[in-house]
């Protein structure tokens, strides 16, 4: 069985030219699959039937693997079995038609107004702090995705009209407003940006002058959140979710929020209506004389 796995790794590395990260992920998943098969005396790939594939998923779930990781394991196994079909080792792919457990929709966590004020209450004039605050203010002000913030250039912002041009999913461009505080923070950052010796027109650059990567932006946000005493873990998703939730609470205009967020389908935006209803239900329970629950 290991012989075919080695052939597969060579195929991925040399013909498909997958990244080392992808290759390592596939190897990790297939190592776990091999362990399950060996523990159950399956010594040949021809013994792997649809029921065996389901058994692998069941055992993986039993060991505590989450839904997203289960989907990744099934994908890795399915692609390897497809390779065995190409090699003539199998006639059909036994993983075809088998689905991983569906991932449940989780309500996104958001940051309340008090926490946001605490987060952004920083008047440091250090260049890195000016940059980081500008990123936070802009992301929260316009509800940007991480990739949208990372891709901004100097020409993306119009300070006179306070509009920002972003490239969203599917290379769809949209124009968004940004607020007074974000405008001020970005302009303060631009005053010191040249100190970083920028190598191109990226709006946010690292200390080496390169466009900041998604990971470096995430890391800076984590550091900022800890430093500002935020109790919960800070990440770009939370700022975007906070923007969406508070916009919906203030306007109740689902279509407008959909446009601002750049969602193709209204159903994606509707998750925030559940958040909004949850908030309203809590207020109702606390305020309505006939709704208060006995303790």
UniProtKB/Swiss-Prot annotation:
It is found in: Cytoplasm. One of its GO terms (molecular function) is tyrosine-based site-specific recombinase activity. The active site is at 145, 169, 237, 240, 263, 272 (o-(3'-phospho-dna)-tyrosine intermediate). Keywords: Cell cycle, Cell division, Chromosome partition, Cytoplasm, DNA integration, DNA recombination, DNA-binding. Pfam families: Phage_int_SAM_1 (PF02899), Phage_integrase (PF00589). GO terms for cellular component: cytoplasm. PROSITE patterns: CB (PS51900), TYR_RECOMBINASE (PS51898). It comes from the Bacteria. The keyword Transport does not apply. One of its GO terms (biological process) is chromosome segregation. Its main location: cytoplasm. Residues 1-85 form the Core-binding (CB) domain. PANTHER family: PHAGE INTEGRASE-RELATED, TYROSINE RECOMBINASE XERC. Site-specific tyrosine recombinase, which acts by catalyzing the cutting and rejoining of the recombining DNA molecules. The XerC-XerD complex is essential to convert dimers of the bacterial chromosome into monomers to permit their segregation at cell division. It also contributes to the segregational stability of plasmids. Forms a cyclic heterotetrameric complex composed of two molecules of XerC and two molecules of XerD. Belongs to the 'phage' integrase family. XerC subfamily. HAMAP family: Recomb_XerC_XerD. This is Tyrosine recombinase XerC.
